[in-house]
From Swiss-Prot:
GO terms for molecular function: magnesium ion binding; phosphopyruvate hydratase activity. It is found in: Cytoplasm; Secreted; Cell surface. Catalyzes the reversible conversion of 2-phosphoglycerate (2-PG) into phosphoenolpyruvate (PEP). It is essential for the degradation of carbohydrates via glycolysis. The gene is eno. Mg(2+) binds at residues 240, 283, 310. Keywords: Cytoplasm, Glycolysis, Lyase, Magnesium, Metal-binding, Secreted. Belongs to the enolase family. This is Enolase. GO terms for cellular component: cell surface; extracellular region; phosphopyruvate hydratase complex. The keyword DNA damage does not apply. SUPFAM superfamilies: Enolase C-terminal domain-like, Enolase N-terminal domain-like. NCBIfam families: eno. InterPro entries: Enolase (IPR000941), Enolase-like_C_sf (IPR036849), Enolase-like_N (IPR029017), Enolase_C (IPR020810), Enolase_CS (IPR020809), Enolase_N (IPR020811).
Amino acid sequence: MNIKQIKAREVLDSRGNPTVEVDVILDDDTIGSAMVPSGASTGQREALELRDGGTRYLGKGVLKAVEFVNTEICNTLINFGIEDLGKIDQAMIDLDGTETKSRLGANAILAVSLAVAHANANRQHKPLYMSLNQGENYKLPVPMMNIINGGEHANNNVDIQEFMIIPAGAPSFKEALRYGAEVFHHLKAVLEAKNMNTTVGDEGGFAPDLSSNEDAIKVILEAIDNAGYKAGKDIFIGIDAASSEFYENGTYNLVSENKSLNSEEFVDYLANWVENYPIISIEDGMDENDWNGWNLLTKKIGDKVQLVGDDLYVTNSKFLKQGIEKNITNSILIKVNQIGTLTETFQVMKMATDAGYTSVMSHRSGETEDTTIADLAVATGCGQIKTGSLSRSDRLAKYNRLLRIEEELGAKAVYPGLDAFNHLN
């Protein structure tokens, strides 16, 4: 079955900024559609979105990217067979001709890549995860729920970008979601009792002003306890430090605590948390260019927790290969829009698996109602997903999609729990 038409349009994401939506239409009029997200704290090496500049939408319009899809990309891909996603993605990479997809825009290329996958699944009358993986059993992901937001995701004084709860002790995804929602509501009550702000950040988590970064962990533990769960048994904690956002000239500047730490001191700062709290995952613990710091961190706590590279690797095989060779981190965050095609996403995930690294499927802070990443988490069996807190429909859409997938699979659905985190001693 061949591609007959490709249509793109400008739509809005969860922050009210434009993004690209694409419909891929086949000869039999089957349609596949996808929308792409956008990040706030972005790695320096990410594939580049194409934005219009000027005054329209404060410079963030995507009409140029839309035009490239409707002309160059459409003209190139018409009559391509829908079954060979690798060939289609490579044709777009070649057409773009830049390393960072900056000519056509990673937002244009990715929207087409995802829409092609959806069109192929719809043609087969299969859900996307099943179209991408014809397996017997499917692994549902353990959710990493960002319930306190700081850093670039919130207007508060918390330096660390995300404090997450991880309901790895739940027996199923459905129950994990319930654990998370109950803790979220109890956290709101805890914050209200302390006269703290309960407005939410970009990813649906609360964004209170706190006297220290560590206080975020303490209020979460209080909420877990109040909800009737045991921290370290039912629910664990994950951190996304996004440390590149507060790293400058070799120093980690924790403004909320009036501290400036060198790499070794910041490693000790994080290691102290791991020692004292049920933390099982730390993402972007060190700056994306502080390879020495990453080496120190991996040696110190890499056998106790999952150390996830996000800004460090930007879902790119070239950078992951360097990390594997240097023996730093033990996990990679997967954001499809950092690399710009589904084919390259699968390639980097295979490289991670082959090296014994885990992969964590992830949303971006600027999201849409598109639920593709939920299917990708199940199709790849990566076992973990980051898709925000327990509020905002752009986040809940992914969780609700996973609920439907688990129900659809019945006995074929496996919830891995702590087994998804294979670096814990």
